[in-house]
Amino acid sequence: KEEAEATFKWWLDIFGEDYYIELQRHDIPDQIYVNDTLLQYAKKYNVKVIATNDAHYVDQADANAHDILLCINTGEKQATPKMKDFGDDDMMVKGKRFAFYNDQFYFKTQSEMTNLFEDVPQAIDYTNEIVDKVQLLDLKRDILLPAFPIPPTFKIHDDDVLNQWEYLKHLTFEGAKKRYVDIDAEHEERINFELFTIKTMGFAGYFLIVMDFIRAGRDMGVFVGPGRGSAAGSVVAYCIGITNIDPMKYNLLFERFLNPDRKSMPDIDTDFDDDGRQRVIDYVVEKYGKNQVAQLITYGTMAAKTSIKDVARVMDLPISESNALSKFVPERPGISLNRLIYAPLSGDGSLADKENLSPDEMANAKTLRSILEDQKDVRSNILKEALVLEGSVRNTGVHAAGLIIAPSDLTDLIPIAVAKDSNLYVTQFEGEVIESGSVIKMDFLGLRTLSIIKTALNLIKQNHGVEIDIDTIPLDDVTTFELYQHGETNGTFQFESPGMQKYLKELKPDKFEDLIAMNALYRPGPLEYIPTYIKRKHGRESIVYDLPEMEEILKETYGVTVYQEQVMLLSQRLANFTKGDADTLRKAMGKKQKDVLDKMKSKFIAGCEKNNFAPKVCEKIWTDWEAFAQYAFNKSHSTCYAFVAYQTA
């Protein structure tokens, strides 16, 4: 007790007026004794007391589910006797398991807390006092970027962000002279549009950082991919060497990458050969400092099948019965047990409508509901607890590719942690939350195909004395296309599956654009449009455009809407959408955002009517888009990966 009082006074001397004593009441004997002692000290030294509750679950009824979760985490069975007398969470006693003392560790209401501390009413008042003192952590702030060093010549403004933009502008036009033989008015207009958008959003530093580590990687002999995702739609990125695909040649759109009407975080992901990836990460850590670079945490949650199996193990259901019960859940990623049990079977928002369950899967869902309703069936309790635990965090991991680079020590900006499988700090926030906090996330990906290409080129040089620059090979090589036409694509990146080989033999691709289209079409959803694409290429099916104005944009894909970029361009051409509007439409169609689409439809029809297009035709175009545009693919990404595939062949 004397030691406790000395510690009490030590903290009081440090914090003074901001020192409070926390009281919790969970009906635990040891806690009752400690509270009495703390109240004595508080009275003796005139220290304020506050009331809190140690909440580990929301509702009191979830206490058992929480106990099961503890058993899952510790590998115990719930039938194992509980160890309630402990002074240390890490204490282990043979034949007993860790458990909470009772069911009082839930989120209590204001009235419950007031009643619980009715003998110490000031504890509630002082709790509110602390709330008033707390400064809210607002994650919404200006983009957080390291100060990228630039030559003194470009430090012409008081604002570092503007100076970085001046340097980026210089590098872009210098790079454009090398990329393009002649910079015509169209090139200049596109470059200026992109630079203006980058300047407005304050992202120049981001481009410089990515350019720098890609350049460093190449200098170290690391193989870097030609680009990935929507960033390949940027001419600025192409001119400064971030990407290696000319966006203007393939009609790739910058606004697919950065929407000029809506500030959103840029996202440039980069592929490296397997060995080179770590060397580039090491370069970044050395340049910016270990305290400013972190990997991203991932949270593994309990999915439908997992929650059933985990709960069944804890509740000692035989494995055979556990497996049989979990088999009633369809083998589909993202399927929800709560939806299977509680969603309507038919009609709007039903299992038939949203999940599109087969008759057998629908019958299994009904079986699960029957089991839950049968209170005498032990499996009913398992389902009941599995429903509560579905979505709970089961484990943490480290994102395979994600990295953040901060302008200062990360401990001053976001919560961080350490992980046994990472040499770097790990964020406690996941990627989406990190980005909403204006911390830049970048993906450093290892691509085995680049390692294969690198090895092949080294062997050619070693055995034949020929050095090949794989990034400048001609894209009209007849022999290469013959491989594709015969379906001889074993080991060829993205084109090696038997289904793809079958379609390649039918398509007989003879131009690079065919490979881009096939890369975009060969995936669930648009797969059914491949036969139409093939027939139209070979003239076995006529190409019909709803409006003549659509031909310019859809001609390359024989009238089939393959790419998101085509929808974006058509909306601008037919309905005078801005570049920003077009990107908003693309995103809404891909994510099936009905409320946004309803507004955009009215705008589209009105814009078309202004341009004297028949409303009926425009309605049909919109309906076609709604049916297919959710499957339309990112042309920038497809072009980059078709290029890697061509290099592989």
Placement of each model-derived feature along the sequence:
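Alpha-helical scaffold/interaction cores of sigma-54-like transcription cofactors
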Residues: 1-649
